[in-house]
Amino acid sequence: MISSLHRPTLAKVDLSAISENIEQVVSHIPKQVQTFAVVKANAYGHGAVEVAKHVSKQVDGFCVSNLDEALELRQAGIEQPILILGVVLPDGVPLAIQENISLTVASLEWLTLAQKQGLDLTGLTCHIKVDSGMGRIGVRNLKDADNLIAGLKALGADVEGIFTHFATADEADDSKFKRQLSFFTDLVDNLTDRPRLVHASNSATSIWHAATVFNTVRLGVVIYGLNPSGSVLELPYNIQPALSLETALIHVKTLPAGQDVGYGATYTTTDEEVIGTLPIGYADGWTRDLQGFHVIVDGQLCPIVGRVSMDQITVRLPKVYPLGTPVTLMGENGGVSITATEVAEKRGTINYEVLCLLSDRVPRSYD
C-alpha cells in the first residue's frame, strides 16, 4: 500500500525515546547481558530500518519474525547479528548463510528435512527453540534438544543459542511463568552441549522478573514505550511512548438536530452539533470498533460519532474550528493525552496490535 504523503495524517516516531527506553530497561537488569532489540512487524509499526539504524550502537543484535524482515535490515546496511524468531524452512538456509542471518530451529523434523536435502550447514548460525509451555514451536524435552544440537553441529552449523518464550510473564498470577522457567532452566542445565547464548526474557520478563534473566534478553514492545501488560501491572519505572498519531480537520459543518451521520445512520444529532471530518479510517488501521472513542482537538476530547469509514471518521466538536486544525489520535495535545493502551481497551485488544495495524498508508516521520 502506498504511503499517503499529501494528506495531514502522520505517525511521528521519537527515536530518542526508543533509545532512552532501552537504556532504562537495561539499567534495571541486575547483571550484564547481551541485548537484542525486537524489530519484527516493522518494529511494531515504528519502522524497522529507521529504528535499527538509530539503536545499532546500543544493542548487540536484532530479532525479526521471518527471512524477509531480516533481509530488509541487511539491505539497509545493518551489520549486527539478526536472529529470526520464526521457523525458516531448510530451503532458506543458503540465503541465510549468504547474508549472515541466524535461524531458529524448532524441531527434529527440520533437521531430518535438511539432511534429506543434503544441506551443508557450514556457516549457518542457529538458535534452538524450546517449547516450555507456550505450545507453539520448539522441542519439548531434553533428549530432543540434545539430539537437535548434535545433529545440527554434525552438518556444520554453529549452534549459538537456545531460548524459550513465556506465555504469562505479563500477568499478575506468576504460577505458569514459574513452571515454564523451571522447565527451561532444568533443560538448559542438563544439556550435553550447552550453547553460548541462553535467553528467555522478553519485555515483560525483563521488567517484572529481571532477576530470572539468563545471559541474553529480547526487548520488544517496551522499547517503544508500551506497557507489555496493558494496564494489568504497573511499570516499576517510567518509559516513554515513541509514536504519536496525528491528523487535521479537513471539513467542518454545523448540523441541525435529527441529522444522521455515517454509514448505517448509527448516529443522529440530538441538537445542533458541529461535526468535523478527519482523513483517517480503517484502511489506515483506525478500525471500525473505535466508533464512540475520542480524539483530541485543542486540548479537548472529542467523540468519534458515526461509523469509522475506510478513509474518514467524523467527530463531534465543541465549536467550529478552521480547516487544518491539528487533531491527535494518539499522543498529547494541550495537556490531554490518548495512549495506545486506551485505544486497545476500547477495541478489546492489546496495545501491540494497535500499533502493528497502522498501515503503510500512514507515513512515518522521525525525530
UniProtKB/Swiss-Prot annotation:
Its cofactor is pyridoxal 5'-phosphate. GO terms for biological process: D-alanine biosynthetic process; peptidoglycan biosynthetic process. Keywords: Isomerase, Pyridoxal phosphate. It holds the Pfam family Ala_racemase_C. It is an enzyme of class 5 (isomerase). The active site is at K40, Y263. The keyword Isomerase applies. It comes from the Bacteria. InterPro entries: Ala_racemase, Ala_racemase/Decarboxylase_C, Ala_racemase_C, Ala_racemase_N, Ala_racemase_pyridoxalP-BS, PLP-binding_barrel. GO terms for molecular function: alanine racemase activity; pyridoxal phosphate binding. Substrate binds at R136, M310. It catalyses: L-alanine = D-alanine. The modification N6-(pyridoxal phosphate)lysine is found at K40. Belongs to the alanine racemase family. NCBIfam families: alr. Catalyzes the interconversion of L-alanine and D-alanine. May also act on other amino acids. HAMAP family: Ala_racemase. This is Alanine racemase. It comes from Streptococcus thermophilus (strain ATCC BAA-250 / LMG 18311).
